[in-house]
């Protein structure tokens, strides 16, 4: 009977070690991706890694809680040999995490109770909880239950209700300023509030607000002036421009006014 239990315990430990090794490999792979491939890592890939690690942890928990699993809690581990010297075989088995199995390391690795500091804090919290009266504790429990109920009710509400409330709030809240809108309409329609300033540029005399046209010679004027340059001696005076005639361009071209009966070869 004892040999059978020992074999079951060994088989259980081998299965547990294999599953822990798989979990360890998944963690190492995920940490490597986070440290070296973070620029190419996508959020769906991160979720897949988390799902894989969570599934492996759930499998280990199911294995430990299974009724057919031998009672490993009744097993006691006793250190048979303690040495302050470095143990290469132990370092190899623990991947150089525990190179020495000495008196300082054994309490940390084989402890079945919390640290003394943690145990003292637990005792202090237990004493504070014992000092609270039943009525005060009941009131605190009711307040906490009410808070949790309200939170669960908000979380369980349909999404449509939340969307309708949000749309109602948006409709009730104005999205514009009426004063600014009225000022803009008055400025565009009636020129209210606009400053009275003239556009840049010279203004023709007698017509304020109307810019004077450019008086530079055009291409046609330059051509005519070049063609009639040899008749400058035969040209007559140019009639001066009358002021107050808008749109009339003063010309520098000398015109040749002749009689209809005049001919250059008449003797």
UniProtKB/Swiss-Prot annotation:
GO CC annotation: core mediator complex; mediator complex
Organism: Danio rerio
Biased composition (Low complexity): 236-247
Similarity comment: family membership: Belongs to the Mediator complex subunit 8 family.
Protein's name in the database: Mediator of RNA polymerase II transcription subunit 8
UniProt-annotated stretches for the region Disordered: 156-180, 227-267
One Pfam family of this chain: Med8
Keyword Mitochondrion: no
GO molecular function terms noted in the UniProt entry: RNA polymerase II cis-regulatory region sequence-specific DNA binding; transcription coregulator activity
One of the GO biological process terms: regulation of transcription by RNA polymerase II
Localization per Swiss-Prot or TrEMBL: Nucleus
Biased composition (Polar residues): 166-180
Coiled coil stretches, renumbered: 2-27, 118-163
Keyword Transcription among UniProt keywords: yes
InterPro entries xrefs: Mediatior_Med8_fun/met
Pathway(s) annotated for this protein in UniProt: Protein modification; protein ubiquitination
Assembly and oligomerization: Component of the Mediator complex. May be part of a multisubunit E3 ubiquitin-protein ligase complex.
Biased composition (Basic and acidic residues): 156-165
Superkingdom field: Eukaryota
UniProt keyword terms in alphabetical order: Activator, Coiled coil, Nucleus, Transcription, Transcription regulation, Ubl conjugation pathway
